């Protein structure tokens, strides 16, 4: 399935357990492999990661391997612990 990057910008991101994470701000590309490596997530201050980052007004990188579905919203596997799979941007 092909999808345009512009089609996922500003889409809300939720865990598979229906907890709000944030919104897609941008996409990270791995130019060596030619694949999307992660999503840059904004609106962290309103999502489930706000207590796990030092500055919730910043953005975080969500590794692409955590994404389970892309549609009207983006679904991700919930982190196993406070920092699993999430990197500060």
From Swiss-Prot:
Domain of life: Archaea
One Pfam family hit: PRC
PANTHER family associated with the record: PRC-BARREL DOMAIN PROTEIN (PTHR38137), PRC-BARREL DOMAIN-CONTAINING PROTEIN (PTHR38137:SF1)
Name the UniProt record assigns to this protein: Uncharacterized protein MJ0916
Species per Swiss-Prot/TrEMBL record: Methanocaldococcus jannaschii (strain ATCC 43067 / DSM 2661 / JAL-1 / JCM 10045 / NBRC 100440)
């Amino acid at each position: 399935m092909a999808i345009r990057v512009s089609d996922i910008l500003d889409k809300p991101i939720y865990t598979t357990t229906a907890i709000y994470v944030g919104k897609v701000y941008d996409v990270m590309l791995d130019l060596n492999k030619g694949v999307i490596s992660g999503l840059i997530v904004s609106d962290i201050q309103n999502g489930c990661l706000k207590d796990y980052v030092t500055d919730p007004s910043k953005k975080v990188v969500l590794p692409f391997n955590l994404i389970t579905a892309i549609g009207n919203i983006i679904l991700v596997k919930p982190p196993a612990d406070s920092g699993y799979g999430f990197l500060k941007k």
